[in-house]
Swiss-Prot record:
Cross-referenced SUPFAM superfamilies: BAR/IMD domain-like
Any one GO biological process: clathrin-dependent endocytosis
Post-translational modification Phosphoserine, affected residues: 312, 387, 394, 403, 488, 493, 496, 508, 510-511, 533
Region (Mediates interaction with DAB2, EPS15, EPS15R and ITSN1): 521-810
Result of altering residue 10 to E: Binds preferentially to larger liposomes
Modified residues (Phosphothreonine): 385
Protein name: F-BAR domain only protein 2
Gene Ontology MF terms: identical protein binding; phosphatidylinositol binding; phosphatidylinositol-4,5-bisphosphate binding; phosphatidylserine binding
PANTHER family the record matches: F-BAR DOMAIN ONLY PROTEIN 2 (PTHR23065:SF8), PROLINE-SERINE-THREONINE PHOSPHATASE INTERACTING PROTEIN 1 (PTHR23065)
Protein's gene: FCHO2
Length: 810
């Protein structure tokens, strides 16, 4: 049992012990959250280490398997994989521990709320005794003053009337003083009783909290200890495996797996050369009865190149240039003495003679030399041109042997290359834009001097189709990520094709395709402050700030089924400071802290403040508001940095926080969509139904600048639409633009877009359409902003929401 430390040590003259103990209890929630964050960070580190070890184990299997050391890599791989698994097991245990800490944190919040209600009486007693103490002190001072005044009048010989009047006041002050003394006694007794009970309650809560936290830490240390024991076992196993992998065993494995045989070469003795038998043995090998002369010659050439026998090498006769020749007498004797000779063998023997006669005239001027010089031989060898043997290779081998330079050259004498080039150029460049923009194609990057640019290719082949079309035809939902965002600013370069979306030119003036572009678009609006001139700000003025709340709604509609609608709504808050405020901040070492409150946050799933500039109280219990305060030192440094980058700016924007709004499917979309396609070989009918949905907004607001773009393929030759649309033949897209939609619109904001397309290369394939709109003056979540405290005033607050990726499919 722990001693009653809280009961004995939290009294004091100002009776502020209750406040200290209550805030200490609230700090327990912060400790629990920070412990969960610490364990989560440790789990992240362990997971990253496990992945790195797994990658290392895989790389070990890719190392060289040659040599006697190769089997050792298997030992490394096995050990590394086991280490990775150990750390992965620790990650699982830490994740379970995080869930336990989070569950305890939720229970802790509920317990603290209940305790707050229970100690409400003590809080009243504290406030009562504090107020009575102050009143008692004042009544005592008044009583002393009246008594002194009465005695002074008596001593100075004042009139009886003045003395009586002073006596009445003194008696009244005495009664008041006695009354507060009695009240203080009662309040003191009540305060001591309740404070004793409350202090003990707070101590019990802290004891329970610390015991639970220590149990969690014990579980953490045990998990780490178990994993370290497993890691130790893995290391022991690795040491044993390496001890068993001896040098002898490695050499033995290599000898058994890579050995070439155990038979040693036999003994060879010197044998005398029998010239007669050697010459006789040549003819039977050459002679083939009923054989064709050409075939026999090829076989004889192959034999002379691939396996020259020792007998032929022993012929000593050479000509004047050093070439070996056969004696004519031997050849004649062979013809006469052997019945194998025939017209076939004669033709075979005559062909080498012809080659000998043709070789000699190659050096007519150098007949007096006995041997060609080394330089002349090099020149002769260098001038030899091999016959075109590429025709014998398969097409795959030919392409593999060709260099990148050969692929890019255009030679009239190389028909195969020209054919290959024409085949490549004839391909439909479905993925051309992505390759050109990324510049990551292997053929493009392999040669920096490639003469054929994407623009020249485009002059040969038909215009490229949109890069999104192949993706959408194979799978609608997977194609969302592939379709280019039609409302974002076009990013063009010298080598990339023109933008695929027809809205790309119009959107530079109204870029609202993402939350980032919304923030950029808001910058001029937020900068227009109604506050004082930036240069006239003084240290004593209330400093003006402006705020922009911007939300982006992303949606994907699948046909007319509302259950398949996917919605995500995000928002961000930007704060704008006048440039003159920087001088105020830098001249004042302790500027007033800027505190603000975000209201109506019940519909928010997550709030992410700028961790470098903004602080918040995680123990705040109000579910509809949240208070924040800014790190003024960090804000000053950040504003000074912005000022150095752009000294001429009148205002500087700071990203304060981002948030995500909870969504309820199609009910959270301000404009519901449904698309219908009817495709035939000659025509395509399209209908897009839209409906204004005020329930998605806290306060119904007007949707303005509505733009709809639909890609249509199949070779559109004519378009009929209602309301009128614009057809971009180059981009193959239809484009509608509506001024505004609201509850006051026709049919309550419901309507249809219809179009009929005549085709020359039908049928068309249904594609994904994109929609853009915006609304000024309100947000979907209803989030609001207000300043808390003094020193600052809100000069302007700007609210808007707009579309991010707002897509519809059939």
């Amino acid at each position: 049992m722990v001693m009653a430390y809280f009961v004995e040590n939290f009294w004091g003259e100002k009776n502020s012990g209750f406040d200290v103990l209550y805030h200490n209890m609230k700090h327990g929630q912060i400790s629990t959250k920070e412990l969960a964050d610490f364990v989560r960070e440790r789990a992240t580190i362990e997971e990253a280490y496990s992945r790195s070890m797994t990658k290392l184990a895989k790389s070990a299997s890719n190392y060289s398997q040659l040599g006697t050391f190769a089997p050792v890599w298997d030992v490394f791989k096995t050990s590394t994989e086991k280490l990775a698994n150990c750390h992965l097991d620790l990650v699982r245990k830490l994740q379970e521990l995080i869930k336990e800490v989070q569950k305890y944190g939720e229970e802790q919040v509920k317990s603290h709320k209940k305790t707050k209600e229970e100690v409400a009486g003590t809080l009243e007693a504290v406030q009562t005794i504090q107020s009575i103490t102050q009143a008692l002190q004042k009544s005592k001072e008044n009583y002393n003053a009246k008594c002194v005044e009465q005695e002074r009048l008596k001593k100075e010989g004042a009139t009886q009337r003045e003395i009586e009047k002073a006596a009445v006041k003194s008696k009244k002050a005495t009664d008041t003083y006695k009354l507060y003394v009695e009240k203080y006694a009662l309040a003191k007794a009540d305060f001591e009783q309740k404070m004793t009970e409350t202090a003990q309650k707070f101590q019990d809560i802290e004891e329970t909290h610390l015991i639970h936290i220590k149990e969690i830490i014990g579980s953490l240390s045990n998990a780490i200890k178990e994993i370290h024991l497993q890691i130790g076992q893995v290391h022991e196993e690795f040491i044993n495996n390496m001890a068993n992998t001896t040098v002898e065993s490695l050499i033995q494995k290599f000898a058994e797996s890579k050995g070439t045989g155990k038979e040693r070469p036999g003994l060879i003795e010197f044998e005398e050369c029998d010239t007669a038998s050697a010459v006789e043995g040549i003819k039977p090998r050459k002679r083939k009865t009923f054989a064709l002369p050409g075939i026999i010659k090829k076989e004889k050439d192959a034999e002379s190149v691939e396996c020259p026998d020792a007998d032929s090498l022993n012929i000593p006769d050479v000509d004047e240039e050093g070439y070996s020749i056969k004696p004519e007498t031997n050849q004649n004797d062979t013809k006469e003495n052997h019945f194998y000779s025939s017209s076939d063998s004669d033709s075979e023997d005559e062909e080498p003679k012809k080659y000998r006669i043709e070789i000699k005239p190659m050096h007519p001027n150098n007949s007096h030399h006995t041997m060609a010089s080394l330089d002349e031989l090099k020149v002769s060898i260098g001038n030899i041109t091999l016959s075109p043997a590429i025709s014998r290779h398969s097409p795959v081998q030919m392409n593999r042997n060709l260099s990148n330079e050969e692929l890019t050259k255009s030679k009239p004498s190389a028909p195969p290359n020209e054919k290959g080039t024409s085949d490549l150029l004839a391909w439909d460049p479905l993925f051309g834009p992505s390759l050109d923009s990324s510049s990551s194609s292997s053929l493009t990057s392999s040669s920096s001097a490639r003469p054929t640019t994407p623009l020249s290719v485009g002059t040969i082949v038909p215009p490229p189709r949109p890069a999104s079309r192949p993706k959408l035809t194979s799978g609608k939902l997977s194609g969302i990520n592939e379709i280019p965002r039609p409302f974002s600013p076009p990013v063009t370069s010298n080598t990339s094709p023109p933008p695929a979306a027809p809205l790309a030119r119009a959107e530079s003036s109204s870029s609202i395709s993402s939350s980032a572009s919304l923030s950029a678009a808001n910058t001029p609006t937020v900068g227009v402050s109604r506050g004082p001139s930036p240069v006239s700000l003084g240290n004593q003025d209330t400093l003006p700030v402006a705020v922009a709340l911007t939300e982006s709604v992303n949606a994907y509609f699948k046909g007319a089924d509302p259950t398949k609608c996917i919605v995500k709504i995000t928002g961000d808050m930007t704060m704008s400071f006048p440039s003159g405020i920087i001088k105020v901040f830098t001249s004042n070492p302790t500027p007033a802290v800027l505190c603000f409150r975000v209201k109506n946050i019940s519909r928010l799933e997550q709030i992410l403040p700028n961790a470098q500039l903004v602080f918040s109280d995680p123990s705040q219990c109000d579910s509809n508001t949240k208070d924040f305060w800014m790190n003024m030192q960090a804000v000053t440094v950040y504003l000074k940095k912005l000022s150095e980058q752009n000294p001429a700016a009148s205002y500087y924007n700071v990203d304060v926080l981002k948030y995500q709004v909870s969504s309820n499917g199609i009910q959270s979309t301000p404009l519901n969509l449904a698309t219908y396609w009817k495709c035939s070989a000659s025509t395509t009918d399209l209908r897009v139904d839209y409906k204004y949905n005020p329930e998605a907004m806290v306060a119904p607001s007007v949707l303005s600048n509505i733009q709809v773009v639909v890609p249509v393929d199949g070779g559109v030759t004519n378009m009929q639409s209602l309301p009128p649309a614009i057809w971009n033949a180059e981009q193959m897209k239809a484009f509608w633009k509506l001024s505004s939609i609201s509850e006051k619109s026709e049919n309550g904001g419901s309507g249809s877009l219809r179009a009929k397309f005549d085709l020359s290369e039908g049928p068309s394939k249904p594609t994904t359409l994109a929609v853009q709109f915006l609304s000024e003056g309100s947000t979907l979540s209803g989030v609001d902003f207000e300043l808390v405290g003094t020193g600052y005033r809100l000069s302007l607050i700007k609210k808007r929401f707009a579309t991010g990726r707002y897509l519809a499919d059939c």
